[in-house]
Amino acid sequence: MPAGLTEPAGAAAPVVSSASGAVTMAPVAALPVRVEGTPVALGPVTKAPVSVCVESVAPQPLPAPVGTLVTKVVPVTALPKLGSPRLPAPQIVTVKTPGTTTIQLPANLQLPPGTVLIKSNSGQLMLVSPQQAVTGAKTTSNITPRPAVPANTQTVKICTVPNSSSQLMKKVTVAPVKNLTQIGTTVATTASSTSSGQPVALPSSVITVTPAKLVNTVSTLKSSSLGVLSTPSNDARLKAETSVAAQTALPPTVLENVKKCKNFLSMLIKLACSGSQSPEMGQNVKRLVEQLLDAEIEAEEFTRKLYIELKSAPQPHLVPFLKKSVVALRQLLPNSQSFIENCVKEVSGDVVISSCTMTTATSPVVTSTVSPVLVSGATAPRTLSVQQTLNPLAGPGVANTGVVTLHSVAPAAATGGTTAATVLLQTSKPLTTSVPNTVAAVSLQPENPVVSGAAVTLAIPSATFGEASATPLCLPSAKPAITSAGTKADKPAIGTPVQIVTQPSTLLPQAAGIPQTAKVKQLVVQQPSGSSVNHVTSISHSSPLSTQNCGQKTPVNAVMPTSSIIKQITLPGNKLLSLQAQRSSIQSNKIKENGPTCFRGEDDINDVTFMAEVNLDEENACILAAHSDFVGTLIQSCKEEPFLVIGALQKRILDIGKKHDITELNSDAVNLISHATQERLRGLLEKLTTIAQHRMTIYKGSENYILSTDTRSQLKFLEKLDQLEKQRKDLEEREMLLKAAKSRSNKEDPEQLRLKQKAKELQQLELAQIQYRDANLTALAAIGPRKKRPLESGNESFKDNPSTSGTSSLTATKPFRPRITRICLRDLIFCMEQEREMKYSRALYLALLK
């Protein structure tokens, strides 16, 4: 809009301007607004000052513990023209809010130009007339707050102080977010412009006060937040304002669908750009999302290409979901490229500063978002100061101040000038220490001055000397930053007191001449309501850390805590077992980050020892150390029985000992000889058993052996050939005899007579064999079926007597008999040949003779 102010939804009452210059408005949520317009006198002044006062009468409790106060200041700009001066147009103030009610004026009522119609709290209509201003003089409209505002409130004061033009100042007083936990926060933003009459653009400032409950917090600073600010352009600012306006106009159901769709696309890009996927897949998925957000392709085409790229099964509910939410998402995300870059940055790198475990009640988190000022031709510093004052706590030491300063510096997009944006976060609270005047300061220079998420907890080294000293801990960026000193709080506010107890830690490098002493540091965050506190003890050491951001490595010098655990275990016998383990927080966080989609949590759930909090190494050490003293202390034994008869053995030993003058024999010697004999026989039997098993082993069916020569089969084949040859000869001889017997020759040949006689004998022999076979068959038939042997009665009894098959199957089972290994003399000879002591003995010679 060319002139005037635009209030966000919910911050002021809706105002609707008519064509005649009248302004009609109605109160929303009991929030009255008074708008005064002041015309400008003739002269080179190009801006018309307008003063708007928005005041809240009663605190408004919100359903959620998050309160967001958005204040936008758009100064009135006009181009200077040469020529006759003329009066400016009446100022138009427009606030677009759903459900606006207008004031209907009578038809005969005409408002003079420049007057404003305002409805008061009591329902009366008031006309406000403008006041003339002197040409070239500075005009400032001051509005004092009403006394109905409560004391514990949040005040945002935004002042635009030009050098030689008008001044625009607005005070906004809003009720606290939560009545129980009220934090007085004062935010002052001051911007100075040049007197050259060139346009000055002031971007919006967003201040978010979020009380959150932190349990087991891991504080993480993104790598994108370390570096230098980039100056946004006017187009980006306009797109951002358009998206905010579109978001306020959408219904809650559509906003919920848009949020789900945005999370779906963000998770899709993160999974595609993770380390386990190929780079081509990540590029293709990002291109598809960009085309979908830019309306180059529709939801059907997007899902079809996405299924092909990810090689996944079609999802029937995805296309209706995208059709329902992608149109509104395009309105809220006018720049799809920045959305994709933010998703990729979240995947690319997280610089974990430190991780601490805290159990606290509701604690405030102040998040400030500041964008730089665009100034042409001059330097325009801009400071955003956030001060938080907490109730002092009683302690033995002097109340000191801990200052946390966040600096953000970036060059402005202007010619011949730079812009510095400084954010100062001051927390005034007592530190219970034995040495007074100790200040602990932390300075951060982020690339994007957006501090979001949970509270940032850093291991801050402190130094104590007897006098005032400061120990800054800096995370420098690639470009120099402007350091500003801490400011003093205006009013003490009623809030949740927080006590931070710090003990002296290792000293940072100090100036020469100052004594340095190594200290131990312990940080305790404590709530006065009696909640449980976990102590986090760490030995800090400085270690260089390099982070990669858009192809540029930025060194970060931070204090990384290394946790050291020393546990002593008392063992039996007054022994102490010390276990020491050191682990850096960076290593533990790398394990969590570098895992495949990070799924160490599932392994911990499946690990029974982890869930039961059992340390296996410690348990093993205790078991080994506990039982080491009992080894060998208790001896269990039984009385030995002699293998040989003691009387016969002793007599035999004495008979042999007479040759060596041995007349007496100890009982231990007899037992030893008996035991030695037993062991010798046991060894021989084991060897003989092995040899016999090898002898009976059939290697033919084994897969480890291949048959090379089979002599037995060859011999059987030759025997079979001999039998066939013999049968052939017998058959030829028989045929010859039969021919001779049938011949009827009258010659008295003796050879012929011999053949005839032999043929008759052969025939008689065959006839006798046939008769013998028939007699055997007749006798077997008369005797009946022979009785089956018990070993073979299991299966054959079924065929002979089917009626008794049920009982015979139970009684015919073979009893279990232990396998007996039979050892023959050949095995003994082979064993004696293999032993060196018996290879040349007389026993082997006698065995060979047998």
UniProtKB/Swiss-Prot annotation:
| Region Disordered, annotated ranges | 788-812
Record protein name field:
Transcription initiation factor TFIID subunit 4B
* Molecular function per GO: protein heterodimerization activity
List the InterPro entries hit by this protein, alphabetically. Histone-fold (IPR009072), TAF4 (IPR045144), TAF4_C (IPR007900), TAFH/NHR1_dom_sf (IPR037249), TAFH_NHR1 (IPR003894)
Query: What ranges does the record give for the region Required for interaction with P65/RELA, renumbered to this chain?
Result: 504-526
Q: In which tissues is it expressed?
A: Highly expressed in the testes and ovary, whereas lower levels are detected in most other tissues.
| Protein's UniProt keywords contain Phosphoprotein | yes
Q: Name one GO biological process term.
A: positive regulation of transcription initiation by RNA polymerase II
SMART domains per record: TAFH
